[in-house]
Amino acid sequence: HGIVQVDMRNHGLSPRSPEMTYPAMAQDLLDTLDAHQIERATFIGHSMGGKAVMALTALAPERISGLVAIDIAPVDYHVRRHDEIFAAIRAVSESAASTRQQAAQVMREHLQEEGVIQFLLKSFVDGDWRFNVPVLWDQYPHIVGWETIPAWPHPTQFIPGGNSPYVTDAYRDALLAQ
């Protein structure tokens, strides 16, 4: 048994791509399985990663032995919840910030939650972001969206965040259908 931690495309040190659709990200996961010669795996995905592993159920269900989706539902959220975050990230990109401390100072002009700032700063290294900001902004409708896929007929664990708006009773039918 082993664990493979995947940075999704346009995040961390993963390859950059102009496309951020869930079918494309599911293919990335399948390519990762193939690259590591893994026939079947249990997938645990958080947020966008959770949607990517759900999309994998439509692409290669035979390769999935278990699925856990954390703080995400298989729905189109129709809401831009992250505009303030993008504003903070862009402000840092346009500033002369070269350290996390300087970047945090710029971000506090746009964001109130220190936990969110510190989480984002994990991806600020050597004066630059480790995610592809222009593509994430451009592809945002695909990231918050969701195309209905066939139900995966195996148990799936959905874990909501404590005060999260992403897994609520309003999405119960979508969770049961997935």
Region spans (language model):
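Helix-loop "lid/cap" segments that line or gate small-molecule binding pockets
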Residues: 87-94, 102-115, 123, 139, ...
